[in-house]
């Protein structure tokens, strides 16, 4: 076995320190695109997590002073871009990263930018309902701001042709995707406002990914929509797609086809409204003629009412009514007098002495019966209580104790003897038994010795 050279023998501490310095000097800072897992934040405020891809992972730490500058809260499973320094934790020999900055990657970055712009514009009041302009009803001419080759334009024109072929349409072609798209959309909105050809604008495009729709999340486009003096309907993507333009626009349509529905009037609906107006005019004319006919009939009736024979007939009818009312009044008075007489007779019978005496006698008998019952009940209760007290008194009586074989001894002076220390030899004692008294003389006194209990 060969002997190791004396100058190249490493301790574990020295080896880990050397490897750490090599990693830090050779690698320096690196950028990583990875997925976060095992994220934790203890009370110290530092972040500890793992960065991984499909086949590998590495531990990572981000100290409190660095993570304060991160504008989002990392979540497990989130894709991020991390700038970090490679190092080695010497006590355990674990290779790890110290993150210095972090930002979302891919759609996560776009979503963060979307949320930040949304909050800023909301704080400025660009989304408030008070700034929304009403759509014209009906629209005289519609402007469409979209790509001239996209499916959105085809959908809008198809719906407008079906619903209202007579409605004029002005197309303001512009790119809706790519770096130049926001500038083109803003220029088209400003051109439509300058020409004043249309009284409503549709701004939008077909569906796509978040990156495809990003032109409508541009701040320049949002401010151009807000500044437009012509009402704007946003129609970007599908119903689930939401952009900044949707929040700023005067009205949001879920699709370009739906936007065309909102700004146009259906021919069939217009025909139905025309028919309803015609029906209302006919009903108004019928009502006017009916009122005139009613007025004529009323005047004719009033003229007929002034005929002398008709007036005489009315007087005779009134006389018959008065006579009938007089007969009814006499009959009513007679019925009331008869009913009054019957009531007085009933009251007189009620005050007869015999009936009052009979009722008083019955009541007296009831009281006597109730008094006897109460006395018997009270006497029984008293006897029972007396028996209970006598039994209790008997239980504590000294005489009862004597009957069980006990006796009570007292001195000649009548003092009850309880201990031997009260007596002297030659004293006379009196002892009470159950059936009498005996007298005796003390001839000897023998106190009992107290026994001590052993402690266990």
From Swiss-Prot:
Its main location: cytoplasm. GO terms for molecular function: exodeoxyribonuclease VII activity; nucleic acid binding. GO terms for biological process: DNA catabolic process. It is found in: Cytoplasm. The keyword Nuclease applies. It catalyses: Exonucleolytic cleavage in either 5'- to 3'- or 3'- to 5'-direction to yield nucleoside 5'-phosphates. InterPro entries: Exonuc_VII_L, Exonuc_VII_lsu_C, OB-fold_nuc-bd_dom. Keywords: Cytoplasm, Exonuclease, Hydrolase, Nuclease. Its EC number is 3.1.11.6. One of its GO terms (cellular component) is exodeoxyribonuclease VII complex. Bidirectionally degrades single-stranded DNA into large acid-insoluble oligonucleotides, which are then degraded further into small acid-soluble oligonucleotides. Belongs to the XseA family. PANTHER family: EXODEOXYRIBONUCLEASE 7 LARGE SUBUNIT. Heterooligomer composed of large and small subunits. HAMAP family: Exonuc_7_L. This is Exodeoxyribonuclease 7 large subunit. It comes from Erwinia tasmaniensis (strain DSM 17950 / CFBP 7177 / CIP 109463 / NCPPB 4357 / Et1/99). The lineage of its organism: Bacteria, Pseudomonadati, Pseudomonadota, Gammaproteobacteria, Enterobacterales.
């Amino acid at each position: 076995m060969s002997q190791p050279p004396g100058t190249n023998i490493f301790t574990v501490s020295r080896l880990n320190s050397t490897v750490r310095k090599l990693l830090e000097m050779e690698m320096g800072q690196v950028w990583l695109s990875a997925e976060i897992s095992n994220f934790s934040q203890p009370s110290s405020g530092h972040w500890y997590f793992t960065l991984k891809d499909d086949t590998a992972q590495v531990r990572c730490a981000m100290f409190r002073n660095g993570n304060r500058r991160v504008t989002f809260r990392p979540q497990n499973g989130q894709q991020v871009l991390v700038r970090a320094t490679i190092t080695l934790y010497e006590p355990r020999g674990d290779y790890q990263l110290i993150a210095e900055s972090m930002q979302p990657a891919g759609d996560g970055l776009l979503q963060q930018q979307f949320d930040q712009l949304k909050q800023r514009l909301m704080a400025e009041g660009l989304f408030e309902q008070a700034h929304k302009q009403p759509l014209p009803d009906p629209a005289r001419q519609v402007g469409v701001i979209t790509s001239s080759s996209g499916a959105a334009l085809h959908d809008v024109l198809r719906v407008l042709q079906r619903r209202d072929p007579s409605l004029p349409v002005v197309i303001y072609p512009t790119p809706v995707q790519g770096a130049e798209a926001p500038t083109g959309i803003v220029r088209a909105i400003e051109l439509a406002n300058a020409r004043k050809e249309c009284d409503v604008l549709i701004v939008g495009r077909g569906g796509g990914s978040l990156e495809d729709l990003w032109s409508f999340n541009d701040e320049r486009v949002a401010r151009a929509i807000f500044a437009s003096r012509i009402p704007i309907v946003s129609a970007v993507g599908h119903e689930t797609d939401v952009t900044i333009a949707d929040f700023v626009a005067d009205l949001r349509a879920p699709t370009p086809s739906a936007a065309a529905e909102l700004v146009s009037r259906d021919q069939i609906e217009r025909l139905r409204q025309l028919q309803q107006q015609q029906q209302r005019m006919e009903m108004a004319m019928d009502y006017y003629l009916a009122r005139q006919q009613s007025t004529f009939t009323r005047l004719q009736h009033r003229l007929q009412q002034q005929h002398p024979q008709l007036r005489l007939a009315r007087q005779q009818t009134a006389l018959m009514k008065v006579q009938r009312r007089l007969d009814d009044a006499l009959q009513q008075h007679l019925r009331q007098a008869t009913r009054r007489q019957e009531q007085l007779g009933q009251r007189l019978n009620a005050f007869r002495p015999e009936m009052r005496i009979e009722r008083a006698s019955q009541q007296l008998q009831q009281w006597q019966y109730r008094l006897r019952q109460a006395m018997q009940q009270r006497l029984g209760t008293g006897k029972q209580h007396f028996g209970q007290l006598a039994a209790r008194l008997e239980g504590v009586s000294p005489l009862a104790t004597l009957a069980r074989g006990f006796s009570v001894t007292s001195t000649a002076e009548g003092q009850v003897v309880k201990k031997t220390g009260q007596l002297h030899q030659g004293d006379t004692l009196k002892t009470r038994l159950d059936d009498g008294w005996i007298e005796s003389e003390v001839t000897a006194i023998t106190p009992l010795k107290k026994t001590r209990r052993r402690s266990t």
